[in-house]
Amino acid sequence: MSFQDLEAGTRSPAPNRFTGGRQQRPSSRGDPSQEVAAGIFRISTAVNSFFRLVNSIGTPKDTLELRDKLQKTRLQISELVKNTSAKLKEASEADLHGSASQIKKIADAKLAKDFQSVLKEFQKAQRLAAEREITYTPVVTKEIPTSYNAPELDTESLRISQQQALLLQSRRQEVVFLDNEITFNEAIIEEREQGIREIEDQIRDVNGMFKDLALMVNHQGNIVDDISSNLDNSHAATTQATVQLRKAAKTQRSNSSLTCLLILIFGIVLLIVIIVVLV
């Protein structure tokens, strides 16, 4: 018997991707177990949306707006996970110290296992998002300075003089544009590094919830006895992902800084040559 069979409310025909279609969306009436079931449904739905956003990274749809939506969805899921974890603890305490029936305890144990499955999928989505956010840069549409058209003048000498002045001004603006490009790239790198740090914190939070979940399930017995064995693998994968994130961020920052410096030097040399020629 699955947890939705114990609900007194309605059944929803929509299957859940994490529990093989077993999970239904229950009506929450204040009972911790019902709230846990509703929380699991909302988390799994949000994780599905998160996966769709992650799959858009590296495509023409990968914009700053998409990255912002990705971060908001990540924070929303983290909040849902925290709330659902708290309700699961309530249900576990009630089973331990109350007069809950054996059927109720089994149903709550299955809820704990469903919650574990959702957390695993969320961890998988976070690792995939972190890898793609480091590998790909979002598409940014920036306005390029427009070229200048020389006005039509009466004499040839005035026309040439005007063209030279416009050319010099255009080259100066190109140097300024290069400076702005360097500043923009540095801001993008800093923003991505901040995002990586936030992802690391969220991964650690989810890993901590795995440990709390294992303790609750152990109190309930051996109904979900495979949770503890997954903790070590989850911790190792999280640690490896964190190390790779930091290495990739450091390498990207070094390469971007060198490229920007070379562009700036080239622009300055070009401006000096033009000024010397014109003088």
From Swiss-Prot:
Which GO terms label this protein's molecular function in UniProt? Answer: SNAP receptor activity
Recorded GO cellular component terms are:
late endosome; membrane; trans-Golgi network transport vesicle
Q: Which UniProt keywords apply?
A: Acetylation, Coiled coil, Membrane, Protein transport, Transmembrane, Transmembrane helix, Transport
Cytoplasmic compartment ranges equal 2-258
Which tissues does the record link to its expression?
A: A high level expression is seen in the roots while a low level expression is seen in the leaves.
Query: Which SUPFAM superfamilies does the UniProt record give?
Result: t-snare proteins
Topology in the membrane?
Answer: Single-pass type IV membrane protein
- Spans through the membrane: 259-279
* Disulfide cross-links: none
InterPro entries for this protein:
SNARE (IPR010989), Syntaxin (IPR045242), Syntaxin/epimorphin_CS (IPR006012), Syntaxin_N (IPR006011), T_SNARE_dom (IPR000727)
Q: Where is this region: Disordered?
A: 1-34
The parts of the chain that form a coiled coil are 65-94
Return one Gene Ontology term, BP aspect. Golgi to vacuole transport
Record field: compositional bias (Polar residues): 21-31
UniProt signal peptide:
none
Q: Which residues carry this modification: N-acetylserine?
A: S2
- Where does it live in the cell? Prevacuolar compartment membrane
Is Endoplasmic reticulum there in the keyword field? no
Question: Function, please?
Answer: May function in the docking or fusion of transport vesicles with the prevacuolar membrane.
State the family it belongs to.
Belongs to the syntaxin family.
Quaternary form? Interacts with VTI11 and SYP51 to form a t-SNARE complex and with alpha-SNAP to form a 20S complex.
* Name under which the protein is recorded: Syntaxin-21
The species this protein belongs to is Arabidopsis thaliana (Mouse-ear cress)
Encoding gene, per UniProt annotation: SYP21
